[in-house]
Amino acid sequence: MGLLSAPPCTQRITWKGLLLTASLLNFWNPPTTAQVTIEAQPTKVSEGKDVLLLVHNLPQNLTGYIWYKGQIRDLYHYITSYVVDGQIIIYGPAYSGRETIYSNASLLIQNVTQEDAGSYTLHIIMGGDENRGVTGHFTFTLYLETPKPSISSSKLNPREAMEAVSLTCDPETPDASYLWWMNGQSLPMSHRLQLSETNRTLFLLGVTKYTAGPYECEIRNPVSASRSDPFTLNLLPKLPKPYITINNLKPRENKDVLNFTCEPKSENYTYIWWLNGQSLPVSPRVKRPIENRILILPSVTRNETGPYQCEIRDQYGGIRSYPVTLNVLYGPDLPRIYPSFTYYRSGEVLYLSCSADSNPPAQYSWTINGKFQLSGQKLFIPQITTKHSGLYACSVRNSATGKESSKSMTVKVSGKRIPVSLAIGI
């Protein structure tokens, strides 16, 4: 801390010396002459240590000086003062018993606490002129001794190369910085290793045996540094991505038998099947031989297209395959003819439309009285006559399923059309 003038020992006055203190307060004034400099020794202060507020550039012809806690000069913030004439020390309400004032105006604070951190004001009383005085301010920050950190992990047993993990350095410590070490070295540059904004959390993207650790974190501030114990991730063996093989991706409805197989084969895994994101329920229709690795559907309907997934699991977790969706071939169902009107008058428009559920879409054709008219879903006759009366049939065919179906209706066309004006008696 350097050489100090010995603290006066001739006389000490407690707060009861209020009259003398009041007389000192009369000399307070803004600085007019000397530049007072205050520095802390040591410059970085940790809790429980001592700090000396060392004063430089003291002006000449001094009467005394007063120390305040904070930047407000009043009796409440008054710590202690020194009167040169008589070497008298006076203690104020802010005195804690740990402050020592020296004849060179320096202030020693012992066993500093968090409450001691902050601003201090030194007011110097100059003799010869009661209206002259010099004021200096100083602020110091108190740093806590850093605690021994520990590392917490979002996953203790991540799956190799498959899972992201975040490591956090605990505890969160104010006014401190965080450093990370892997295998005793500072972190390498890698897109798989990313730090949070404060460096307190380390993100590992796809942990491998090369990035499993050991890791250490360090908490550091200007007065101390502490490093954690090594932390190593327990990597689980990588699960292979399963996939589904199937004997027929385009089965015919209620006709073809489907065999699903979950690959790869292993005695170390269990197998689970999923349909539409739900675990496949137990059903007499579904057979699962060979420890559930093979799924057999004796038949399939248009409502069972999927998606299907298989999952392989070990004692720690599982992974699913990409979804597989079937293209179930069906139909054509019984066609529908619209509109279903059967009575028309000569001169009216005949427009019929035919539709049937089918995959792939069916081929359509129209016949009248058994005679082919056209191919397509729609039949249009601009002006019908009585000659157009008869049996209209829509036939549908699906070449993929080999199925056919038809629907017929009878159309009757009466004589000459009656004008609307006559029909309503105009």
UniProtKB/Swiss-Prot annotation:
<feature type="domain" description="Ig-like C2-type 1">
    <location>
        <begin position="147"/>
        <end position="234"/>
    </location>
</feature>
<dbReference type="Pfam" id="PF13895">
    <property type="entry name" value="Ig_2"/>
</dbReference>
<feature type="domain" description="Ig-like C2-type 2">
    <location>
        <begin position="240"/>
        <end position="327"/>
    </location>
</feature>
<protein>
    <recommendedName>
        <fullName>Pregnancy-specific beta-1-glycoprotein 8</fullName>
    </recommendedName>
</protein>
<dbReference type="Pfam" id="PF07686">
    <property type="entry name" value="V-set"/>
</dbReference>
<feature type="disulfide bond">
    <location>
        <begin position="262"/>
        <end position="310"/>
    </location>
</feature>
<comment type="similarity">
    <text>Belongs to the immunoglobulin superfamily. CEA family.</text>
</comment>
<feature type="glycosylation site" description="N-linked (GlcNAc...) asparagine">
    <location>
        <position position="303"/>
    </location>
</feature>
<dbReference type="InterPro" id="IPR003598">
    <property type="entry name" value="Ig_sub2"/>
</dbReference>
<dbReference type="InterPro" id="IPR036179">
    <property type="entry name" value="Ig-like_dom_sf"/>
</dbReference>
<keyword id="KW-0732">Signal</keyword>
<dbReference type="InterPro" id="IPR050831">
    <property type="entry name" value="CEA_cell_adhesion"/>
</dbReference>
<dbReference type="InterPro" id="IPR003599">
    <property type="entry name" value="Ig_sub"/>
</dbReference>
<keyword id="KW-0964">Secreted</keyword>
<feature type="disulfide bond">
    <location>
        <begin position="354"/>
        <end position="394"/>
    </location>
</feature>
<dbReference type="GO" id="GO:0005576">
    <property type="term" value="C:extracellular region"/>
</dbReference>
<feature type="domain" description="Ig-like V-type">
    <location>
        <begin position="35"/>
        <end position="144"/>
    </location>
</feature>
<feature type="disulfide bond">
    <location>
        <begin position="169"/>
        <end position="217"/>
    </location>
</feature>
<dbReference type="Pfam" id="PF13927">
    <property type="entry name" value="Ig_3"/>
</dbReference>
<feature type="glycosylation site" description="N-linked (GlcNAc...) asparagine">
    <location>
        <position position="104"/>
    </location>
</feature>
<dbReference type="InterPro" id="IPR013783">
    <property type="entry name" value="Ig-like_fold"/>
</dbReference>
<dbReference type="InterPro" id="IPR007110">
    <property type="entry name" value="Ig-like_dom"/>
</dbReference>
<keyword id="KW-0677">Repeat</keyword>
<keyword id="KW-1015">Disulfide bond</keyword>
<keyword id="KW-0325">Glycoprotein</keyword>
<feature type="glycosylation site" description="N-linked (GlcNAc...) asparagine">
    <location>
        <position position="111"/>
    </location>
</feature>
<keyword id="KW-0393">Immunoglobulin domain</keyword>
<feature type="glycosylation site" description="N-linked (GlcNAc...) asparagine">
    <location>
        <position position="61"/>
    </location>
</feature>
<feature type="glycosylation site" description="N-linked (GlcNAc...) asparagine">
    <location>
        <position position="199"/>
    </location>
</feature>
<feature type="glycosylation site" description="N-linked (GlcNAc...) asparagine">
    <location>
        <position position="268"/>
    </location>
</feature>
<feature type="signal peptide">
    <location>
        <begin position="1"/>
        <end position="34"/>
    </location>
</feature>
<dbReference type="InterPro" id="IPR013106">
    <property type="entry name" value="Ig_V-set"/>
</dbReference>
<feature type="domain" description="Ig-like C2-type 3">
    <location>
        <begin position="335"/>
        <end position="410"/>
    </location>
</feature>
